[in-house]
Amino acid sequence: MGVSDRYMVKWFLGSDANGIYAVAYKIPTILTILAAVFLDAWQLSAIAESDGDRQAHLRFFGRIWDAFASAVFLGAGGIIALSPLLIRLLAEEAYYDAWRYIPVLTLSMAAAAFSNFLGSVYVVTKRSAASFWTSLSGAGTNIVLNLWLIPRMGIQEAAVATFASCLVVFLIRLVNARQLLPFPLSGRKLAIGVTALLVQTLFLLFRWPGWVLAQLAGLAVLLLLGLPALLSTLRVILYRKQANV
């Protein structure tokens, strides 16, 4: 989706706008890369665990999802909060305005990471066709929204189109993948995490009064929300390692 975004930004808005968008896109991609490294290793474990007791497998899947989602939320919240500073440190001064597009693109990368985790369900259940058509639905949404929004509203709308398309894929997979493998997933935690990221994004972009406090509050909520799952999963991993020694 990122390739089509940049192509259309360049087509409609010119090379300068495309350069700013490309710089903004690079920082949230850190989240995607780290998630991809984890998911490559996770899929092997998910396949191996699928040969055992189904209920134990579902609990294992749910536990890993909880920890993964917590880590993604915390990573995304940190990138959003620090986006003006990150651009100042990592990009030339001419590209400083690129920070304005990082928060929405970070939301996109978080949604993409969640979609990729749910894609591991298709690997375990050998439903690769479902992975293809859900990805295709997101690509189609992205192209349509880019064609509609970018000429009218500019660079930020390319980021919005990317977020919307990643969200479409995630929501479709959330329903479809959990029909195939109904692992435990807390809708309440998911809603709280998404709300915290949206609050951070809106306060930062519009510089509403208390925007700094909103970043700190959002990160605190995400930490309180995710820390128990992260610590619990870490204990399980350490226990398994000790048991295998």
Predicted regions and their residues:
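Alpha-helical transmembrane segments of polytopic membrane transporters and translocases
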Residues: 5-7, 19-35, 65-67, 108, ...
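Small-residue hotspots at the loop-to-helix junctions and early N-terminal turns
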Residues: 13-26, 98-103, 159
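Membrane-interface helix-loop junctions in multi-pass transport and translocation proteins
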Residues: 16, 129, 136-171, 175, ...
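Residue-level recognition of pore/gate-forming positions within transmembrane alpha-helices
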Residues: 26-29, 76, 109, 135-140, ...
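Helix-loop junctions and terminal segments of transmembrane helices
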Residues: 28-65, 119-124
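Alpha-helical transmembrane segments of multi-pass membrane transport and lipid-handling proteins
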Residues: 35-38, 61-112, 143-151
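Membrane-interface junctions at transmembrane-helix termini in multi-pass inner-membrane proteins
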Residues: 106-137, 177-179
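Membrane-proximal transmembrane or re-entrant/amphipathic helices at the cytosolic face
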Residues: 202-245
